[in-house]
């Protein structure tokens, strides 16, 4: 019953979002991950039997979302961390390197050349909102754990959040390195 291209895109978006939510719910039930759903849901999804320490980090996300407009907008910018590296990487890998003295022609060529030239910086920069929001959520979760738990348990929450933060940082650096190396290798192959 889809009558237009716009309706088709909306249907695809709806099905994709539902599929992602089902996957998140399943992984949370299994204790593989924990999630905070913002907006109208404003819920934390975690298996407290398997990941009891994760709840403090997720509460930190909730505080970010609900305590200030700044952190709420930083959280909304997290999509840059998903789509930014994909877009920059795709452009860096498909745009030929300009030869010495070769000029750009037009807006699209200028834009893709700029992205190609600055792919490493742009990829890393696209992770800034996610890293900032994740680290702030951990910091707020650590503070709450320190207020509510025994020193031994609070230290376990702190260590849990440190490992979590490290995975985000390593992921950002690995993706940035992959885009940089991939672009250089492609240029080297192109020259051969």
Task: Give the location of each predicted region.
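Hydrophobic alpha-helical segments
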Residues: 25, 57, 134-138
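ATP-binding/phosphotransfer module of carbohydrate and carboxylate kinases, centering on a glycine-rich
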Residues: 71-72
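Active-site recognition of the HExxH zinc-binding catalytic motif
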Residues: 50-67
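Generic hydrophobic/packing signal
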Residues: 35-36, 43, 56, 138-141, ...
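Auxiliary, metal-adjacent structural segments of Zn-dependent hydrolase domains
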Residues: 1-52
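Sequence-level detector for tyrosine residue identity
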Residues: 35-36, 41, 57, 163, ...
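Long, well-structured alpha-helical subdomains associated
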Residues: 80-135, 139, 144-192
């Amino acid at each position: 019953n889809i009558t237009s291209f716009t309706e088709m895109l909306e249907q695809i978006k709806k099905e994709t979002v539902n599929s992602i939510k089902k996957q998140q719910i399943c992984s949370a039930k299994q204790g593989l991950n924990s999630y905070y759903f913002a907006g109208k849901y404003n819920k934390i999804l975690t298996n407290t039997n398997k990941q009891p320490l994760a709840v403090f980090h997720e509460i930190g996300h909730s505080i970010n979302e609900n305590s200030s407009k700044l952190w709420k907008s930083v959280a909304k910018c997290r999509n840059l961390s998903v789509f930014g590296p994909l877009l920059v990487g795709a452009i860096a890998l498909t745009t030929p390197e300009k030869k010495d003295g070769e000029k750009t022609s037009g807006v699209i060529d200028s834009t893709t050349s700029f992205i190609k030239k600055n792919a490493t910086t742009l990829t890393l920069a696209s992770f800034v909102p996610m890293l900032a929001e994740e680290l702030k959520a951990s910091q707020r979760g650590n503070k709450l754990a320190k207020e509510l738990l025994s020193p031994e348990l609070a230290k376990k929450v702190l260590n849990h959040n440190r490992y979590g933060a490290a995975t985000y940082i390593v992921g950002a650096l690995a993706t940035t390195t992959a885009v940089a190396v991939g672009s250089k290798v492609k240029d080297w192959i192109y020259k051969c």
